[in-house]
């Protein structure tokens, strides 16, 4: 089809797949009078071992032809080989699948979700494809992005009960839905995740536990409630790091301030205790809780 452009380079097709969204930079197509649209985000409609095809609307006077580009020049030749022209170039052509800068990530409903504090944006990758974050074809599998209106930096992210959750110190953003056309974002002013406590987030028996600036909180889908009233709140604030884990109905929380503490909350009895073992890290999987220094 004449509204498509075929890009050729050795091994190019091994790096990308059909329906990828790639960002093209450095192409001299506009300077050569071929098309101003080639640079930027492009959908890959077809791919071979050494080539791929993107859509490019015929606009330039020299659109129908072949453009060969290196670091010094770009040579254009008409389809019949009778016309030639050359333009200088200052850069080489690059192609990439862009990934946004993400402060925190979580997985929910076969998508990786992430947040960016500089842009105040929440991103979702293409359905089932964490390599594509800017794929917008108007289908249910599209990538997704939404700007939030709350102040401050993001402090953590987690998934619980089918929701992708993004926290700031005083805000909870809850994102839900099955596809981009019906994704919804609700925001709640509440005690969020404390700074440096993103890893305290831990789901246990359908409840999300985390360390907030005011103590340990539990979220079950409504309002977060404080469960650390029996503890000294001052000793839970201004942490250098906080890591959470779960085992047998107990929430383990390692806190680093001037000294380290390993706190254990029995969620069934509502009781706190403190362990002697103070690991610097932990993870829970397969009915086991692993702690290491």
What is each stretch, according to the model?
Residues 110-111, 150-293:
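Beta-sheet-dominated scaffold domains
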Residues 25-27, 55-57, 78, 123-137, ...:
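Predominantly extracellular/luminal cell-surface or secreted proteins
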Residues 9, 30-34, 95-99, 147-151, ...:
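Surface-exposed ligand/attachment interfaces on beta-rich extracellular proteins
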Residues 5, 56, 78-81, 85, ...:
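Generic recognition of cysteine residues
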Residues 89-91, 137-144, 246-250:
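Surface-exposed acidic, glycine/proline-enriched linker/cap segments
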Residues 1-98:
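Small/polar beta-strand repeat architecture
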